Amino acid sequence: MRKLFGTDGIRGVANVHPMTMEIAMQVGRAIAFLVKKENYRHRIVIGKDTRLSGYMIENAIVAGICSMGVDVLLVGPLPTPGIAFITTSMRADAGVVISASHNPFQDNGIKIFFSDGFKLPDAMELKIEDLVLSQRMLALQPLAEEVGRASRIDDAKGRYIVFLKNTFPKKYTLDGFHIVIDCAHGATYGVAPHVFEELGAKVTALGIEPNGQNINAGCGALHPELMAGKVKELGADIGLAFDGDGDRLIVCDEHGVVVDGDHVMAICAKELLAQRKSKKKTLVATVMSNMGLEVAMKKMGGHLVRADVGDRYVVECMRKNGYSFGGEQSGHLVFLEHMTTGDGILAALQILAIMKKRKKTLSELAQVMQSFPQVLKNVRTAKKISVDSIVGFADAVKKYEMQLGDTGRILVRPSGTEPVIRVMVEGLDSAEINDIADELCELIRRVSNS
């Protein structure tokens, strides 16, 4: 059983186990120990978002890595995909991201990329856990003259901006586009405005004044209403909202209507199919994606494959089976042609390129898919419980699944990052699926509160 790592690295309240300085230093030691294979200077990239606790955790990880004789390259606040890019660009042995993504500023986390820019597999995370908890590394520390050094890459942001612009077709510019962006006071604040402005767009930027405590606070991908309202107010062409670490994108059309990740995937999949760039004509989504996406893919002549929730599992499925595009309803979009992980800014550029090429608004492009009614409810639990242990729960789910038939489905799963059980119900009748979700949530609450 995992003791440190969840579905997306290690995460928790800063300065509380497991997100303590002591654990962070041990994680740094473990990563350094695992990458040391040959007799040469090894290097690990470290980047972060804009949380107050990022500096504390960064220093602890740096100390751990250097104490094992490995050098550190610091890039400062940079989106998660930017850190993956710099890791591969600098031929580093690994990359470390200090971020809790869309969570409030009190939380923080540690995510790790391998030298190829992909997140560590489960087996490698378990090795790190074992090393951290066993204390075996204390006997393996090098002599004083062999400790590592930490240095800063001053132009990391600029390198990433150039990379992003190169993913946008060179025959197009964004001249004539008015774009509203919301950077959530997070890692994209110093990157996104420059990318879109340098490509010729008029940019209205929100969420670009981080103070260490305002990341994701009433803004960004979790609060697209801020971006949408500004689009309507200014008559902009599109709105783009990123989460705290920049690996997620939520968009709104020219009317201020939010377009979720499923619709964006459908838009991009259609274009990739038309260009014959969709490997095996397959889109990889997750179990959370709407049934309407499945229907849309069939109409386009493509296929939908579902992976477990989490962009890392989407990427694992893509790599294992040779697929090129995938994502999540929540806004993680992965274009393996360009990037090894979800990248909000890169995804936005691909959408804008389609709008430019097809000479259509986002609202027109979004007609490619019609969503089935879907309700998603979160039940916060006082203690960790398994739905399998709830008496009568499995029978209730089976009964409702029979009631919905082939035009609906039920998904119940625990969150990988917080004490929450998510209940998703999909079907043709909104009132019916809402009632079903309420009944299932009530069963969970009774056990949680008992």
From Swiss-Prot:
Catalytic activities: alpha-D-glucosamine 1-phosphate = D-glucosamine 6-phosphate
Enzyme superclass (EC): isomerase
Post-translational modification summary for this protein: Activated by phosphorylation.
Keywords attached to this entry: Isomerase, Magnesium, Metal-binding, Phosphoprotein
Protein's job: Catalyzes the conversion of glucosamine-6-phosphate to glucosamine-1-phosphate.
Binding, Mg(2+): S101, D243, D245, D247
GO CC terms in record: cytosol
Enzyme Commission number: 5.4.2.10
Active site feature: S101 (phosphoserine intermediate)
UniProt key word Lipid metabolism: no
Comment on bound cofactor: Binds 1 Mg(2+) ion per subunit.
Biological processes per GO annotation: carbohydrate metabolic process; peptidoglycan biosynthetic process; UDP-N-acetylglucosamine biosynthetic process
Protein name: Phosphoglucosamine mutase
Gene name, Swiss-Prot/TrEMBL: glmM
